[in-house]
Amino acid sequence: MMIYLFLFCKPRLQRIILLFVLAFYSLVLCAQSLDYERMNPHPRLLLTQGGEEAVKKSIATFPSLLKIHERILKESDEILIQQMALRVMEGKRLLGVSRLSLKRIFYLSYAYRMTKEEKYAYRATQEMLSVSRFPDWNPSHFLDVGEMVLALSIGYDWLYEYLEPETRSIVRDAIVEKGLDAAAPDEWFYRAASNWNSVCNGGLLYGALAVFEDVPDKAKKIIEKCLLTNPKALAAYGPDGGYPEGFHYWGYGTSFQVLLIAALESALGPDAGLSEYPDF
């Protein structure tokens, strides 16, 4: 059933399926306590250091996961010859570009970690540099920022040892200035009980965890703001796991909610009780 969904669903749903698979591995590999002093080294988001071997073992065991793996590598090869993402707005949104960047950087970074073929890391780096040089990520529609920060954070974290110091600096500055700094303390999504809360909080959390050692005070504020405001989104699942926005937005919001929780667990340990929220 899973492989059917992956092979025949739309690209964004394919990405969500992969994210759920890797979120599962982060649960298996996570530490045991929420303590900033015990922040894991890079890579710390979802697939931690050495986690590739667990994925490879599963690929060798389960044919459905092998097909997903092969599909990602095939799409990564196709990305290598495609034009770089451009900052082209659709009405008031940049969301399509953010999602394209997330898919490309995520797939390419995964392909590099699983194969060690430099062509994937090189192209992922070029994608990250390209969007890092955008003037902004359209903070007036903050979903665009949330997904773009997630894209850059995964690439920065997963390719950390590959990236040149200058490249790290450019990408890190973009995550901070166009992501973390773009979120005002009173942003409305912090008060929302909808997919916006999970998506925007999730993206910002990934950014904070990715660059934590360079801006610890700022990162802690983002993390703690997330822990304070994210339960509003979890309450929307009550009383029986339904979702007031319907099944489509249930899938969108829940995928980012799972990613949010998995990032806390893979980077720090427990998730501060988010996964135990009564209605979630």
Where on the chain are the PLM-derived regions?
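N-terminal secretory signal peptides that target proteins for export/translocation
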Residues: 1-14
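Beta-rich carbohydrate-recognition and catalytic domains
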Residues: 41
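Sec-dependent signal peptide hydrophobic core
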Residues: 17-22
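Aromatic-lined, polymer-binding surfaces characteristic
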Residues: 44-59, 65-280
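Positively charged, low-complexity intrinsically disordered regions
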Residues: 13-16, 45
